[in-house]
């Protein structure tokens, strides 16, 4: 019987092609993937690329982070669903609802601002009224016991 000894050696370093071009405006860093000489693990090595200053396109994130194209699609679907005759009515009702929510929020905020000032005065009044009520109940209960 012959015994043989097999040794495992690590594969040579592998350099994978980059997934993005260096001029791409979407990626800010380029990474290459290589293997370490004595291990079998992959390591990402980052390189910083100096980007030329570019102009950002005009964007409008007006409603819940939605852009103009998304809002246009939503408006188109709404026009198809409700028709051109009902859209003004729906717009008016949505506007009234939003206005009422804004008004309620302002009232709530004003109540919160005035509440601390009034709460100090009310707490002293409530404390005195509670004491008066306790005295009245004690007097009425004692008068019932006497009868």
Curated annotation (Swiss-Prot):
Topological domain ranges for the Lumenal compartment: 60-61
Location of the transit peptide in the chain: 1-59
Gene3D superfamilies: 1.20.5.3310
One BP term from GO: protein transport within lipid bilayer
Bilayer topology annotation: Single-pass membrane protein
Localization of this protein: Plastid, Chloroplast thylakoid membrane
Residue ranges crossing the lipid bilayer per the database entry: 62-82
Membrane topology (Stromal): 83-147
Highest rank taxon of the organism: Eukaryota
Chain's role: Part of the twin-arginine translocation (Tat) system that transports large folded proteins containing a characteristic twin-arginine motif in their signal peptide across the thylakoid membrane. Involved in delta pH-dependent protein transport required for chloroplast development, especially thylakoid membrane formation. TATC and TATB mediate precursor recognition, whereas TATA facilitates translocation.
Summary of subunit composition and partner proteins: In thylakoid membranes, TATC and TATB form a large receptor complex, containing about eight TATC-TATB pairs, which binds the precursor protein. Twin arginine signal peptide promotes pH-triggered docking of TATA oligomers to TATC-TATB receptor complex, inducing a conformational switch of TATA that results in activation of the translocase. TATA dissociates from TATC-TATB upon completion of translocation.
Name of the protein in its database record: Sec-independent protein translocase protein TATA, chloroplastic
Source organism of this protein record: Arabidopsis thaliana
Gene designation per UniProt: TATA
């Amino acid at each position: 019987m012959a015994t043989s000894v097999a040794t495992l050696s690590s594969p040579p370093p592998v350099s994978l092609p980059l997934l993005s071009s260096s001029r791409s405006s979407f990626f800010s860093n380029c990474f290459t993937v290589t293997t370490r000489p004595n291990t079998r693990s992959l390591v990402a090595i980052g390189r910083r690329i100096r980007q030329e200053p570019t102009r950002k396109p005009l964007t409008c994130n007006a409603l819940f982070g939605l852009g103009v194209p998304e809002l246009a699609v939503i408006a188109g679907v709404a026009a198809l669903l409700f028709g051109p005759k009902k859209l003004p009515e729906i717009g008016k009702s949505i506007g009234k609802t939003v206005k009422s929510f804004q008004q309620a929020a302002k009232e709530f905020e004003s109540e919160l601002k005035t509440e601390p000032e009034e709460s100090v005065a009310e707490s002293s009044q409530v404390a005195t009224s509670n004491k008066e009520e306790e005295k009245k109940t004690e007097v009425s209960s004692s008068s019932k016991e006497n009868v």
